[in-house]
Amino acid sequence: MRSHTATMVDRIEDTSRADREAALADAGHNVFELASDDVAVDLLTDSGTGTMSNDQWAAMLQGDEAYAGSASFEDLAVAAEDVMGFQHIIPAHQGRGAENVLYGAVLSAGDTVLNNAHFDTTRAHVAANDATPVDCPVDGARDPDTDAPFKGNFSVERARRVVDDVGADAVPVVVLTITNNSMAGQPVSIENTREVAAFADDIDATFVIDACRFAENAHFVQQREPGYEHDSVAAIAREQLSYADACVMSGKKDGLVNVGGFVGLHDDGRLHEQCRQRGILYEGFSTYGGMSGRDMAAFAVGLREAVEPPYVAERVAQVQRLADALTDRDVPIYQPAGGHAVYIDANAALPHLPREQFPGQAFVCELYREGGVRAVELGRFAFPDTDRRDLVRLALPRRTYGPDHLDHVADTAAAVCERGTDVTGLEIVSEPELTELRHFSAALQPVA
């Protein structure tokens, strides 16, 4: 039984297949351009799309909208320290704002940034600072059929080879993303976190944890890592984050809110002051950072709710339920399932399409055409010039959809797979200059 009830509902508009085909064509076969009213089940992202609790809504009514010295900011700062262990935060309007604040302070042209796997905005921020993003996944991370408990881990061995090549002075930042969104939402172990921290210390680099899904990662540690089975999710999260010098946090994930983020730091030294000044310049004064007081109030409550055992266990179980439903219908997926999403293996589902015709994006379009399901491609289209598989992410908004919605998604995906060779590939018609973010706004068309 779910640990919560619904006190407000949102109507799903009914659309015909003809309606969806017309909408898809108007959108340039890019589902980011679809109107939400034209979508039946929206699994584009879990970022800021979830359902807030009544306690969060109650906190919003008491939000302090003061420009400086907001009591709501103080509530958020206390929650960040209590839950995540960071004594100092620089608020931002969302995670990518926090990335801009932090990476702009620590990167210079010609630098190299090591990460277990850069996600799209992180990769773009690194590139925007004329630095080079390098992924260091462990062996087997890219194999959708390999069964391992922590496929999101960071390969220190691979990272050392990069340092040997470019020099330690060229690597000012080492990033660990938990969970590893680009590698199908796979978790990272505490043991690996310690290893990465020691490696960063060895090369005198700032160790940053991208903590957007820290609570989901802590749940996996509790379930899979020996020695942590009796520890609480809250205690595990605090330990894992304690090894980092800084964190980037998006409240739109494990903050359980619709907007907001921050840079977290353990001390108030030079990096803190640099980030504070950049925050004021780009995000707003250091006690709001682009958030309203009511948003900060809800964020403070959401951080505490994210590590509550019933919530996080139910969250991960719902993702597993969707994975099981897809597997039961012979839809090829990345195994094991992650904590926030299920990833369909489009290369296996549509083997007749060459990678140049974007099988992942083709599958995304067919999901929408077939059943009004919006997903996102995370493969050659989203990450050009990489060797990542063509995956289709089905990201579940938190506390939002029920079993019947998941069954509809699974049935729709199965119907796409059954059509097989009838699915046509795509080609790009136009794309932005910053190709790291092309999947947000590029236009495509079916291959003739």
Swiss-Prot record:
Catalytic activity: L-tryptophan + H2O = indole + pyruvate + NH4(+)
GO molecular function: lyase activity; tryptophanase activity
Cofactor dependence: pyridoxal 5'-phosphate
InterPro entries referenced in this protein's UniProt entry, alphabetically: ArAA_b-elim_lyase/Thr_aldolase, Beta-eliminating_lyase, PyrdxlP-dep_Trfase, PyrdxlP-dep_Trfase_major, PyrdxlP-dep_Trfase_small, TNase, Tryptophanase_CS
Keyword entries, A-Z: Lyase, Pyridoxal phosphate, Tryptophan catabolism
Pathway(s) per entry: Amino-acid degradation; L-tryptophan degradation via pyruvate pathway; indole and pyruvate from L-tryptophan: step 1/1
Alphabetized PROSITE patterns for the sequence: BETA_ELIM_LYASE (PS00853)
Chain positions with N6-(pyridoxal phosphate)lysine modification: 253
Pfam family, one: Beta_elim_lyase
Source organism, top-level taxon: Archaea
EC identifiers of the protein: 4.1.99.1
Family (UniProt): Belongs to the beta-eliminating lyase family.
PANTHER family: BETA-ELIMINATING LYASE-LIKE PROTEIN-RELATED, TRYPTOPHANASE
Name of this chain's protein: Probable tryptophanase
